[in-house]
Amino acid sequence: VSLLEIQDLKVHFHTEDGVVKAVDGASFSVEKGETLGIVGESGCGKSVANMTILGLTRSPNTEIEGRILLEGEDLIQASPDEMQAVRGQDIAMIFQDPLTSLHPFYKIGKQLVEAVQAHQDVSKKEARDRAAELLGLVGIPDASNRLDDYPHEFSGGMRQRAMIAMALVNDPHILIADEPTTALDVTIQAQILHLIQELQERLGMAVILITHDLGVVADTADYINVMYAGRIVEAGTLDEIFYDPQHPYTWGLLGSVARPDRPRTERLSQIQGQPPSLLAPPQGCHFRPRCPHEFDKCKQTPPLDPRSGTPGHLDRCWLSPEQKRTLRVIQGDQIGLEAPAA
């Protein structure tokens, strides 16, 4: 049994303008100690899928189908009280903007103590000691005294470290990191990603890393799901996605990334067009209107199938393996990275 398994998840929001198909049949799994990267443009459904895992999208106007199995137990069928126990205890989440995630009027220590006592029957002193221990664990110096600081007295990187500490108060089995480095400068981004990796190795938890930046997952993920317009269009190991991509959307993402092995004067390629409205997604393949390789069959919805000879490498495209090989030769090094020497 997988630690977490998502089966054909659909999340549709009923609005005045129509039904928004935010997640349209996503399936994936996460094992203990693994890091899964979920990559895609803003609005592709990656955050909605993971907020649904935590039960944060439930409302009278939300239609949720499929199964979310945590060690075999279906969270979609769980009651609100049961989900409250799951949040923080089994699965924790770091949100992308720590400034808005922390309450500006309460000290960091008060917020951490509250998180500890929400799931543990401990005294306020014990909870405060645990809070100081966690701040020290995430690399904040003089942790005991910094508990009495307000969020605005922390730098952006320190606020994100405090959010990571809050997520770890109950030693969760799974940590969901939703764009954890978006609001940080490049140097601090690297520190936060390294911290998450270090904590994962120390605590043995699984990590789901949500991002629009391929560079973020390049050094951290074991597996990658590429999402587009509510659907997973390609899934595989880190090496499969970076060195042997199979879906035209993945080709476009990789081609638009600046690389140190290319001349600085070379123009980056771009994906033409705009992401579709999830109120009225295109018929068949959702990437069809932007794909330079579209043909008639693309008006039918392609399945997420294994690539021939590689069972764990899946892609949602009607192009045959031979056609993909030909297109990659024609487009040259704009698609994928050069495989490392053996």
Model-predicted regions and their roles:
Residues 149-154, 158:
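Conserved ABC ATPase signature
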